[in-house]
Amino acid sequence: GYRTMKITDEFLVKGYYRNYDGMHLLKHALHNTCPDMMKSIGKDEHGNDIKVRDSEGIQLANAKIDEIRNGFSEWLEEQSPQFKERLTTMYNRKFNCFVRPKYDGSHQTFPDLNLKGLASRGIRSVYPSQMDCVWMLKQNGGGICDHEVGTGKTLIMCIAAHEMKRLNLAHKPMIIGLKANVAEIAATYQAAYPNARILYASEKDFSTANRVRFFNNIKNNDYDCVIMSHDQFGKIPQSPELQQRILQAELDTVEENLEVLRQQGKNVSRAMLKGLEKRKHNLEAKLEKVEHAIKSRTDDVVDFKQMGIDHIFIDESHQFKNLTFNTRHDRVAGLGNSEGSQKALNMLFAIRTIQERTGKDLGATFLSGTTISNSLTELYLLFKYLRPKELERQDIRCFDAWSAIFAKKTTDFEFNVTNNVVQKERCLLYTSPS
């Protein structure tokens, strides 16, 4: 087709092995990637090129890609008012349609709360911040409590769990915490609500001999709250059918990303392709294992779905931050391990079980003094855990789609361990959609 001089000359980046014109760079701008440019620094003993990354070429390509993005904004400014208004309306309805509410829980009376019992544990009253947080959780059916250490997250969990049960917002809530803290959580709940039916899991309950009986106990009884440690929670089997659906959805996203990269041909790095192919292989292995579990399952296994838990409070929720995610980016620093941990994946299975039961997002409350510690990936993963339906409404199915809207990559140059200057990409800037 017809190509203007602007495409073929002005936006041309000359590499050692090949050139990249404006059309190539436009594709990279749309996919939020950059050409993987190499150059030769000599020959090896067999006469083959010794290849290294062409940092100068990549830097120039990044500059041209930024120019294309800025040019798109300039092009938009030149369009008719009607076109801009229509585009703005479409964007705002999809991404910029939320206003952060202010929650005032001062009107709550907490009729079953035993303040005398709490006083024996050194708790004199419920802080306004705790009331506001409980009101937020009751209104939304869960959320994030990012209060600092010492601001009373334990009491928030206990009151919110009991209030949800009292108001039929949840029928069987669960609280999980660190092994060192979970006894304190159970004692606080018992002091706050001495008449509540609480099931607190001991180490003996989770012994191999007693575990099946304990799981059936959760399933067959109407407890006000079930309390256990993170480690104990990890021993609860998850529904294999639900695992199969989630892993298949992850695999579908990986295959979509692979197809996008293959369409770009040699414009993308082998490492990027290799990373996604490895992830695909790992997911296929997990799916095979789950399918085997479905075929060989016995009737006496009680899984999380059968227990009837319909809300889970996760104290120190940052312990589950290493959730699996899909990305095409292989050279962006600070993204973490996209494979994630089995511990976090197990939590995703549990939260999805609750969300499928209730037919809506949330169904869980994350409590931590360090909700986000060191990367934007953790922010995306909070949405993945808690707001899957909203992400689907926004057509966000992977980290790359989310970061293209809400984040921006920055490129810096720094010295590596061999004192050479290397390019480092980071997902640093959070861009508000407003």
Per-segment meaning from a language model:
Residues 1-95, 194, 218-226, 242-264, ...:
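Charged, low-complexity intrinsically disordered regions
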Residues 105-143:
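Conserved pre-motif I regulatory segment
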Residues 140-143, 171, 362-363:
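Pre-Walker A (Motif I) flank of P-loop NTPase domains
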Residues 141-160:
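Walker A/P-loop
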Residues 160-185, 358-361:
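Conserved SF1/SF2 helicase motif Ia
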Residues 191, 195-204, 248-277, 311, ...:
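Conserved P-loop NTPase motor "coupling/switch" region that bridges the ATPase
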Residues 201-209, 231:
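Conserved helicase motor
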Residues 229-257, 272, 279-307, 342-350:
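Conserved RecA-like ASCE ATPase "motif II neighborhood" in helicase/translocase motors
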